């Protein structure tokens, strides 16, 4: 499911919002949907962004400060910056991943971009609908992106013999044939406060 192009596109947007210096995600979404930003303008923007000390989203919102990029590309980059800044605001306001994705695909015109009249268009749109349903169980964006990273990692390593090192919180809900819990020291983990609270009803 997470290997489908449309799902990867949406997740790249979310990763960039969550980690504004994620160049790989930015490179994936900068022209999705098409914004008319050429390779030369993109390269000049990234050089300027790196020298400015700003993260990618901040640089997009201050792109008028550079004259090395064409006016048309600056406008397109600034518009993208406004969308991403607004989505960042939703994350900071504690909106759910479903609300964030819904706003994102509306603001970017991504759904219209998917419905391009090809035979695959409806299937792609249905996949976005399935993603919106799937994220309902996540309270915040960080939790969802962590789950995506775990699923992607599991898919990559499927069938390989390996040891997976993770926190107890990251392991919640997962199943393994053998589990070793290290650092279990009474009073530290579980916390001594567990015993002070008394039995749960």
What are these regions (language model features)?
Residues 1:
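Conserved phosphate-binding/catalytic loops in two-lobed NTP-binding clefts
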Residues 4, 11-201:
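Conserved helicase C-terminal RecA-like lobe
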């Amino acid at each position: 499911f997470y290997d489908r192009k449309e799902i990867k596109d949406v997740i790249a947007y979310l990763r960039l919002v969550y980690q504004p210096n994620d160049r790989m995600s930015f490179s994936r979404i900068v022209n999705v949907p098409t914004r008319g930003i050429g390779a030369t303008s993109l390269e000049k923007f990234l050089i300027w962004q790196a020298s400015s000390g700003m993260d990618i989203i901040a640089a997009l919102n201050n792109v008028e400060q550079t004259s090395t990029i064409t006016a048309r590309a600056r406008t397109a980059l600034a518009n993208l910056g406004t969308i991403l800044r607004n989505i960042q605001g939703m994350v900071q306001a504690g909106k759910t991943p479903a609300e964030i994705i819904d706003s994102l695909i509306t603001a970017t015109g991504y759904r219209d971009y998917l419905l391009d009249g090809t035979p695959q268009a409806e299937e792609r749109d249905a996949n976005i609908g399935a993603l919106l349903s799937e994220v309902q169980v996540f309270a915040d964006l960080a939790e969802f992106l962590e789950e995506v990273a775990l699923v992607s990692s599991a898919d990559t390593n499927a069938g390989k013999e390996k040891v997976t090192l993770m926190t107890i919180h990251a392991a919640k809900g997962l199943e393994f044939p053998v589990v070793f819990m290290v650092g279990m020291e009474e009073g530290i983990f579980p916390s001594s406060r567990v015993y002070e609270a008394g039995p749960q009803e």
